Amino acid sequence: MATALVLGYSAFDLGLFSDKDPRLKLIKKAIRKDLEAMAADGVSWLVFTGSLGFEYWVLEVAQEMKTEYGFQLATIFAFETHGENWNEDNQMKLSRFKQVDFVKYAYPRYEHKGQLRDYQQFLLENTNSSYLFYDEENETKLAYFYQKMKNQEDYFIKRLTFDQLNELAENFSEN
């Protein structure tokens, strides 16, 4: 059973502040294409951390594909307090992360930075691959986690990059 951890840029990192942004259609098209390939490679579980942006968009697409491709979806939040201060729209998105096949919380609340390190290690040890929207040339807080993934033995990383999106956009506009 192949399990992929889903991580990537936040909507804020990408400057996408509206669910109606036309760039989302292209991003979701790339996600669908990648998820189809991952399903063909045997990925059956997608594991989320509950972040808005790329993770949420993958969740939306995976839920659309769930019946046809048999995906199982899990959200493992770092803390039970995750998202409690979010606005109403984001609370609705958070509720979708909680309406999956498996939901757990690593800790009741944040107490010290060691919890995040242990949480990341737990995620790496309990998945055997990742689906990551991350480009080393556009670093964010994911840089440390990405490095840990690369150092993890026998850990497959499927990346979506800006170059791939640009190529898809060029092909999309030609058709």
Swiss-Prot record:
- Pfam families named in the record: YpsA
State what protein this is by name. Answer: UPF0398 protein SPH_0478
Question: Family assignment?
Answer: Belongs to the UPF0398 family.
Mind giving the lineage of the organism this protein is from?
Answer: Bacteria, Bacillati, Bacillota, Bacilli, Lactobacillales
Xref: PANTHER family: UPF0398 PROTEIN SPR0331, UPF0398 PROTEIN YPSA
